[in-house]
Amino acid sequence: MTTNNPVCASDAHMEMYSSKLYTSALFLNLIIATTSMILTGFAIQKLFMESIINISTRMFLFCGLMCCSLHQTAYIVLRIQVIYQVFFKLSEPCNLYYPAIDCKYVTFSLVAGNTGMIFIQSAMTIDRIFATIFPKLWPKLKYWPGVVLSILMIACNYANVQIIFWGDPLTEYVPTCGQFPSKSVNRFQTFLAIALYMSIAHMVINVIILYINVLQDRQQSKSFNVNQRYQSREALKSSQAIFFLSMSQFFACLIYSVFTKVFLEFQLNLSPLQSGLVLALSYTTPYACIAIPSLIIFTFRFIKNQRLRNINELRSQTETGDECMRKIAKIWEK
């Protein structure tokens, strides 16, 4: 339940709503969010149309894109709300703020989108660990690792969001739905610190896995078993793709975590206009949600080209091996 007495916007907040620079930043946010949704659509099409990496990895990437879409959808709704305030409600300063309870789904979706991308990163890392430890067994499981780990991480993400907002009655009024409820801020900051350590762990583990896969590929490249060499190359390419995407997500999480912690720490020292402009121009997740689908599209194209080159190399190596065996047979017959 919210209080029956709405809060009127202060002169400082009215300055923010009236700022043409702030309004321009809002439209820029809309353009960025809309662009990311379009790129996400192309990336999802790539995931479904091209099977150049294993199905589990594609499932994780799909879940990551869904987290981006969840965040960006809420972000678009948020920005449209503020633009509506700017154009149609400036004459009603006591009717500008939103009850926090009415912003529940927008706020929860923004947080769930951010935290979901971190948990999906964990799922991809766990999958690569088992694929490296059990190189023969893991491919035979097909899509099951992706299904199980995706469900597990989605459940963890849902539980995490509930814990962050646990016991918060959401009774206050907020200038925009993007403003974090004051009673949940401490738990959210705690998760940001944990998420940063999680991302560092993901990076270290993926570097180790990539190194192991390179060694495995070098060993298998000497084998005459084409299937083993092909599986080894596939594992290496999947690890390279996940390492590349994990690296980008790591930096996105690092920047997001540091930015959010610093912003929450110094927010009270900023005027509403300064605070609004900082959030509108420096909030990193919308940019990350443009980068991730773009990187997926680029990575798929790169792997596809590499795969074609590798297949041609394997064919030429197989012919060379057969010729060698024929020569040995001729020598033996003599």
UniProtKB/Swiss-Prot annotation:
It is a multi-pass membrane protein. Residues 45-57, 127-145, 213-239, 299-334 are cytoplasmic. It is found in: Membrane. InterPro entries: 7TM_GPCR_serpentine_rcpt_Sra (IPR000344), Nematode_rcpt-like_serp_alpha (IPR051080). GO terms for biological process: detection of chemical stimulus involved in sensory perception; olfactory learning. Pfam families: 7TM_GPCR_Sra. It comes from the Eukaryota. The keyword Transmembrane helix applies. The chain crosses the membrane at residues 24-44, 58-80, 106-126, 146-166, 192-212, 240-260, 278-298. Expressed in interneurons AIY and AVB in L1 larvae. In adults, strong expression is seen in AIY and AIA but only weak expression in AVB. The keyword Membrane applies. One of its GO terms (molecular function) is olfactory receptor activity. A G protein-coupled receptor required for olfactory imprinting a requisite in ordorant response such as benzaldehyde and isoamylalcohol. Belongs to the nematode receptor-like protein sra family. This is Serpentine receptor class alpha-11. It comes from Caenorhabditis elegans.
